[in-house]
UniProtKB/Swiss-Prot annotation:
Protein name: Chaperone protein HtpG
Gene from which the chain derives: htpG
Places the protein is found: Cytoplasm
PANTHER family for this protein: HEAT SHOCK PROTEIN 90 FAMILY MEMBER
Entry similarity comment: Belongs to the heat shock protein 90 family.
Keywords of the record: ATP-binding, Chaperone, Cytoplasm, Nucleotide-binding, Stress response
Length: 637
């Protein structure tokens, strides 16, 4: 962003950064059908400004001057084709105007642009609130936006102005032109947006979109007219549940969460006893874009007796960070600092209570409506499973609520899994990796499928970590199918009544011993496999170390000095193994090539590359040529 800066109070002209300019052009030339969203976004910003003033006034009451009651007013000027949204909140100084409205120094801008360009028009408007760029939605209906603001406690007032075409100006304004405190946003409406000067339309929009913000909203039909209160600022969460309709809950959810969907789950309760507080919590239907950003602020707003304190309090564990809403405490002191909040035993007790309540309500939904719960899981399952790793005190509950894709189907619970255990099965088997389709085709599953043993298919990054935390479910430990012995001998095969597999020939037994000796520098062991039925070989990890997927992750982030030697398991009844053993009986060079080819084949089946792709190709050609010569000479089987 470039600028012409005058510290003596003259006009200052600036150029938007490229991403912001592009964003503005998207708004100016918007084809979105639902442009009403702009008013909700401006009212939401105004309400936030009022709440921040109330918080700062706790330590500095002089900021309130003579005007202590927060308010938002919306003025219609049909003659001038203008609409103004004014609040008496915290206000902004010169630098704050530039920082808040001239730049968007956050990753959300670029992500918004990328997704909005790809979205259909109906979906694109929903991205406005989702990505936190709501102020700029004003340019969907205005060809110029003026923002006049005076910060609480300051004499100077400033005007920010832009036509959305790449530049903006910041100029000082006379005190008489500015609010005594707070911000006024004036939209110069485009010709096709004159409908937003209709009183009934604006009144309906306020009631539908913003009727439950905790600040009174008044509508002024024309300049100089008496304000008419449209919303009284009564906090929705203070009302009894029986008096609140589903649509009121949905409107409040969209306001507090910045979402455009319906809540998938609403939890509203009042706690009394050692701690007294009210919580109104929502689980969204769709995943906000920034849930995995490590520096993202938490999304529960903390109030103390209806005074907004912070939206960065540690009110829920990280694995529930998708929950939105408000918590209003009657016990915390109003003058508590944001730093002291995190150390408050009262807050710790509130966190424990609402965490338990959310989990309890999710359990009820899972039992009552598996399909609705399944949609929540599809959206938030990857982060919810972090609780298996992080929340030792609630691990059993989180495990019970978790759903998994398995070899038996999608969204299976562990209760379903344990209920389908096979005879003599003592473990919950899983296979972890990065690609669900590759997991489904893994040779490690063959022996389990042959016995009808269900295997969890884990493809989320967190999966490789929570399974190492030693969890069990209903007394059954989790065991990777790529680690240690499969222990399948005690579980009968589905085709147990058919003719048994032939005994391993002496030649194959000798060939396996040769593999073990030849590959001793590369593998820790070579052994006959009971997990393979269709594939010739596979790699597994030693019993005591990390499984194959976790080792790859740890190597990738530099947490391991080097890879451990895997175990090479060989299917002694596979035709390829038998043929290689027979063809190499009197040819050591052939057997050495065969040994290394089988190891590279196992690496490929495990999702890796051969150790040396060129040598792998040459070795394969040599084996085929020798095999063909021996077969044509009558030396093969």
């Amino acid at each position: 962003m470039t600028s012409t800066i005058d510290k003596n109070g003259a006009a200052e002209s600036r150029v938007f950064e490229a991403d912001v300019a592009k964003l503005l052009q998207m708004m100016v030339h918007s084809v979105y059908s639902d442009k009403d969203v702009f008013l909700r976004e401006l009212i939401s910003n105004a309400a936030d400004a009022c709440e921040r003033l109330r918080y700062e006034a706790i330590s500095d009451p002089a900021l309130l001057t003579d005007e202590t009651r927060p308010r938002i007013s919306i003025t219609i000027d049909a003659e001038r084709r203008q609409l103004a949204v004014e609040d008496n909140g915290i206000g902004m100084g010169r630098d704050e105007l530039v920082d808040a409205l001239g730049t968007i120094a956050r990753s959300g801008t670029k992500a918004f642009i990328e997704q909005a360009e790809a979205a259909e028009s109906g979906d694109g408007v929903a991205l406005i609130g989702q990505f936190g760029v709501g102020f700029y939605s004003a340019f969907m209906v205005a060809d110029q936006v003026d923002v006049v603001s005076r910060r609480a406690g300051a004499r100077e007032a400033w005007r920010w102005s832009s036509d959305g075409k790449g530049t903006f100006t910041v100029t000082p304004v006379d005190e008489s032109e500015a609010p005594a405190r707070g911000t006024r946003v004036t939209l110069h409406l485009t010709e096709d947006a004159t409908g937003y000067t209709d009183r009934l339309k604006i009144e309906q929009m306020i009631k539908e979109q913003s009727g439950h913000v905790p600040v009174p909203i008044a509508l002024i039909e024309k300049p100089g007219a008496e304000p008419a209160e449209i919303a009284d600022g009564a906090a929705l969460w203070t009302r009894p549940r029986g008096e609140i309709s589903a649509s009121e809950y949905a409107d409040f959810y969209r306001s507090v969460a910045g979402q455009f969907d319906e809540p998938a789950l609403t939890v509203h309760f009042r706690a009394e006893g050692r701690q007294e507080f009210t919580a109104l919590l929502f689980v969204p239907q769709t995943r906000p874009f920034d849930l995995f950003e490590p520096d993202k602020k938490r999304q529960l707003k903390l109030y103390v007796r209806r005074v907004f304190i912070t939206e960065d309090a540690d009110l829920l564990p990280r694995y529930l960070r998708f929950v939105r809403g408000v918590v209003d405490s009657a016990d915390l002191p109003l003058n508590i600092s944001r730093e002291m909040i995190q150390e408050s035993p009262i807050l710790a007790a509130i966190k424990k209570s609402i965490t338990g309540r959310i989990l309890s309500e999710l359990e009820k939904l899972a039992d009552k409506d598996a399909q609705a719960y399944g949609k929540i899981w599809e959206a938030f399952g990857p982060m919810f499973k972090e609780g298996i790793y992080d929340a030792a005190d609630r691990r059993d509950t989180v495990l019970g609520l978790s759903r998994f894709r398995t070899t038996a189907g999608s969204l299976r619970s562990l209760k379903d899994y344990v209920g389908a255990l096979k005879e003599n099965q003592t473990s919950i088997y899983y296979l972890a990796g990065q690609d669900a389709a590759r997991l489904e085709a893994s040779p490690h599953l063959e022996g389990f499928r042959a016995r009808g043993v269900e295997v969890l298919l884990l493809s989320d990054p967190v999966d490789s970590f929570w399974v190492t935390s030693g969890p069990s479910f209903e007394g059954k430990p989790f065991k990777s199918v790529t680690q240690g012995a499969a222990d399948l001998a005690a579980i009968p095969r589905l085709d147990a009544g058919t003719e048994p597999s032939p005994d391993v020939s002496e030649g194959v037994t000798e060939f396996l011993a040769f593999l073990k000796t030849t590959l001793s520098d590369l593998v820790s062991d070579v052994r006959s496999s009971d997990r393979l039925t269709d594939s010739p070989v596979c790699l597994v990890a030693a019993e005591s170390g990390p499984d194959r997927q976790l080792e790859k992750i740890l190597l990738g982030v530099g947490q391991l000095a080097g890879a451990s030697k895997p175990v090479l398991e060989v299917n002694p009844n596979h035709p390829l193994v038998a043929s290689l053993a027979a063809l190499g009986q009197d040819d050591r060079e052939f057997k050495e090539d065969a040994a290394r080819m089988l190891l590279d084949d196992a690496r490929v089946l495990d999702g890796d590359r051969p150790s040396d792709a060129l040598e792998f190709s040459r070795r394969l050609i040599r084996l085929v040529e020798r095999g063909l010569r021996r077969s044509s000479a009558g030396g093969g089987d």
